[in-house]
Amino acid sequence: MFLRTVRSQAVRAAALHHTVAPALCMRPVLRTQTVAFSSTPVTLGKKKKGGKEPKAAAKAAAEEAVDEDLFMIEWNKFEDLSAKSVAAFAAKAKEIKAGNNSPDLINNIEVKISKDEVYQIKDIASVALKGGRTLSISVYDPSHTKQVTASILASDLNMNPQPQANSPQILNIPLPPPSAESRAEQQKELKALYNAFKADKKLTSGLAAIRDAFKKDHKKMADQKSIGKDVVKREDKKFEELQKAWTSKIEKEFKTVSDEIAKK
């Protein structure tokens, strides 16, 4: 509309050329406006082939970021559960390494204090392994020392607690050194535990069960049509890397404890 008006003005100016003084009809304003406006359509407006409009590209990037955040939530859960699994394996592996030297062997022995009072040793005393060859029991109430001693002797553990000379309420139990047979049995038990945590899907606290559950969830998310293929490909690779990392960690724990048993 503006171009049409300018053009009309230019036409009228040309018509007045013969009747108006030369100085007035030579003013450049109308000609400049006409040229500047008419050049605008030539310089604007061609979109590159195969390109995306800025708004469309921004929307696609935002959607991709949301998809990646969804996967990130899943991976955080996976790492948390995997860390707990490796910690559980490490704790059980240490129990196997301790063998008959473990304080847990006597912690649950029941002690009858009186007719109506029965406690477990862990409730009335602290038990610790000292020097690798001695279990030390510190009874909280000195009057309970005799009952604790009697309960340990009555158990089937073949242990003989001895009161410490300068502190009668502290009982020491000397432990025999491990034999080649006991070491071999510990190694066998440790290997079975390691295989269960690594590959047994029935062990819910193991890496295999956790990995299997997340594989199913991952597939459900990847199958959603709303999630882009590029995102799925990247997340597939990341999941593989996480699995390898945690498998490597539990393997490292296994080797560490296995070496410690061999050197006992």
Curated annotation (Swiss-Prot):
Segment forming the signal sequence: none
Family annotation (Pfam families): RRF
Organism superkingdom: Eukaryota
GO CC annotations, alphabetized: mitochondrion
Record flagged with keyword Nucleotidyltransferase: no
UniProt GO MF annotations: ribosomal large subunit binding
UniProt keyword terms in alphabetical order: Mitochondrion, Protein biosynthesis, Transit peptide
Subcellular location: Mitochondrion
GO terms under biological process: translation
Keyword DNA-binding tagged: no
InterPro entries linked: Ribosome_recyc_fac, Ribosome_recyc_fac_dom, RRF_sf
Transmembrane annotation, as ranges: none
Biological function: Necessary for protein synthesis in mitochondria. Functions as a ribosome recycling factor in mitochondria.
PANTHER family named among the record's database cross-references: MITOCHONDRIAL RIBOSOME RECYCLING FACTOR PSEUDO 1, RIBOSOME RECYCLING FACTOR
Family, similarity comment: Belongs to the RRF family.
Protein name from the UniProt record: Ribosome-recycling factor, mitochondrial
Organism: Yarrowia lipolytica (strain CLIB 122 / E 150)
Gene name per UniProt: RRF1
